[in-house]
Every structure is written in C-alpha cells, then in structure tokens.
Amino acid sequence: MTEPLKPRIDFDGPLDVDQNPKFRAQQTFDENQAQNFAPATLDEAPEEEGQVEAVMDAALRPKRSLWRKMVMGGLALFGASVVGQGVQWTMNAWQTQDWVALGGCAAGALIIGAGVGSVVTEWRRLWRLRQRAHERDEARDLLHSHGTGKGRAFCEKLAQQAGIDQSHPALQRWYASIHETQNDREVVSLYAHLVQPVLDAQARREISRSAAESTLMIAVSPLALVDMAFIAWRNLRLINRIATLYGIELGYYSRLRLFKLVLLNIAFAGASELVREVGMDWMSQDLAARLSTRAAQGIGAGLLTARLGIKAMELCRPLPWIDDDKPRLGDFRRQLIGQVKETLQKGKTPSEK
C-alpha cells in the first residue's frame, strides 16, 4: 500500500532570517578595577606534550651514528683480544705449572665474567625501559584499530608484567566485560578503565606522599644542603617505586636514563604550568602574605616533586593517557597547601599556650 501525499504547507516568514547580534554597552574600568582581572591564557599543553613526546622518543631510540658503531666495534675487538690473551696465559701457566699465575688468571676470569654479567643485566634493563615506549606505541595503535585478536593478548601481557594476579577483582571484572564480538580498541579501552586505574591509584599515592614529605622537609628544615640531599634522595626513590609499580626493573644506567628523561621533560615543558597552578591559589587566597618564605619554598619543592612523579608515571605507564585521566598539579596543590597550613598552625598552638 502507498501512503497518501501530505498537503502542502506554506510558511509566512522568509527562509533566511537575518540575525542581528546584540552588543552590550561600552564599559570603562579604572586602574583599581583593572587589577582584579587576569589575562586569559591559552592552553598550549597539547603542543608542548607533542614536542616533549618527540624529544623523549629521540632520547629513547637514538640513531646509530658512525662514531657509535666505531666505538662499539673497537670495544668488541678489545674484548676479544683480552679473552684471547687470557686463554694464552692460562695455557702457558698450565704447561709450566705456574700455579700463582694460574690463580691470577682464574681471578681475572671471575672479575671479567662478573663485569660482563653486570653489563648484560644493565643492557637488559635499559632495553626493557625502551620496550615500554614501543608498548605505548602499540597500545596507541590498538586504541585506533578495528581489528580483533590482538587486544586481549596485549592486555594480558601488561597485567603479567605489572604483577597483577589472575584472581584480582579488577582483572576479573575486565574478563567479565569482554566478549568475542568486541574489537581491539574496545578491549584495550576496557582494560584502561578497569585494570590500569588500580596501578595509577598506587602511583598517585606514592607521588602525594613524596610531595608532602618534600614540602614539610623544606618548610621546617633550616639547612639548604640537607634539603637538597633529601629532595634528591626522595625523588630517586619515587622514580624507583613508580617504575616497580608498572613492572619495570631499573638498573644503574636505566635509572639515569629515566631520571634524565624526566628532567628533560620538565625543562622542556617549562615552568608555566607550575606558575599558573601556584598563582591560582596564592593570588586568590593571598597565601603569600600568610605563609613564611620557607613554607612557600616547601610548596614549590613539593610541586616540583609531584611534577617529576607525574612525568615518571607517564614514561613508565604502558598505556597512553585517554579520556583526560592524566593527573595534574592541581590534584596535589590543595593537599600540599593544606598540609603546610596545618603544620604551621600546630607549630603556633604550643607557643601560644
């Protein structure tokens, strides 16, 4: 059956209605009123993050230059010569029954073996840190993929690396939420929303605790040298704990590489975010007039520690940030200021009594 045609409808008004914008009347502000306004700042974080990501990728995956190949070839040739000379000395000592020389050769072999073993271990740990960057790239590709079959195996590998047991409630919820009809993007997204926040919450607690300790230490300590040593030790310890949470075992060189990348990231991004975050509270609440100089320095050191922890978290995390779940300095700012104010109030209360 065919439906009957609807009758024609005639409209009285024109199709295009001229919209005249309405402007408010002009207002003039004096100097006192102008001081209450702050200029609007454009959010340049995505551009900075993209530039920082490129710098980090270049540092994690350096190019194989000719000089680097020549140095590596020279070291390999020198190592082969040392091994050959050691074998020749050992054979001569055995033939001449020079037991003292034979013992020296055995001791040298043990020392060389220990050195080679430590170098191999450090190289493996540094390779593991570089692999984490490749895993983030793979996760980013899977989050834009409509294929099937790779997402589940990838997420199970991440859970195994992080030490998450199969009976963990978050992992069980993830298993219950996925099914065969979902593509890789949906599987990885579910893992990022159900399982990954468990590790992120632990890393946030570590950052909050280290930032609070740095803030209070600077606020109450009168010795600058002790403050510097304490902050350096706490920052290195924070990086180690965050790397351990995300399943990365840091060696000496990989720890230096990660610390270098974190400092490079902070220096490249600049202090604009730090100044903006601190100024939001200090300008609005006039805390600069109520807090001492040491307390202000403590808050600054705590925020720098928090920023370092956030960047270390970003480098060790196997998944890229999605849905604006990246922690910000504002998450730790109010907590640090509240702790400093509480500490100062506790210090004034006994003196008043």
Swiss-Prot record:
It is found in: Cell inner membrane. One of its GO terms (cellular component) is plasma membrane. Signal peptide: none annotated. It comes from Escherichia coli O127:H6 (strain E2348/69 / EPEC). The chain crosses the membrane at residues 70-90, 100-120, 213-233. It is a multi-pass membrane protein. This is UPF0283 membrane protein YcjF. The gene is ycjF. Keywords: Cell inner membrane, Cell membrane, Membrane, Transmembrane, Transmembrane helix. Its main location: membrane. Belongs to the UPF0283 family.
